[in-house]
């Protein structure tokens, strides 16, 4: 039985990945922080695809709630979680002059600490590798961390966020080493996919045009990358950036 937990699954990329996983035969636990109505819609669409789901509210800046989330998901879906998507994220502007202790803690907490705690919980389930038709180990677990193309193209803006995502990229590789062969760990580094809350349509359209390929990213690009990770048992510790080549800008 395939069971997934997607954090921040009520809206945007999280919703798209949750629905994609349901389409691939996963029962999906839908995590949300405050967007209950959106999460309920995601859950309803998962049920419409014939899969089980559960709505799970948790503040991922709260250590106890974060530690409890994956075990709650496993209990709700009736067995171990085999796919964890660490998608929930805080993305707020700061720089070397404006960053505060609070902005630092919020970004590190949501983008690095919470994924680490959830990864520990995934590991604690005791998943074991199976054997494929070559009698070689095949991982039964997959963790996908939503990172950001900017870790390959650093700028001094969004500093706390960027540092947290750099940590998540390092964590992706080190946990891939630590959890093999039972669990694979990979990252997706999106480029301009959906208009930001504080962006105008014109600014977002220009951001998409400014990539190397002169095009942005669609939700299908993100879910295709997730699908590749599901289907590629020899891939771990990798970052794929569906970003129109934004990370190559100079």
Question: Across the structure, where does each feature detected by a protein language model lie?
Answer:
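Conserved glycine-rich Rossmann-like NAD(P)H-binding loop of the short-chain dehydrogenase/reductase
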Residues: 24-40
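Conserved NAD(P)H cofactor-binding loop of Rossmann-fold oxidoreductase domains
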Residues: 87-92, 245
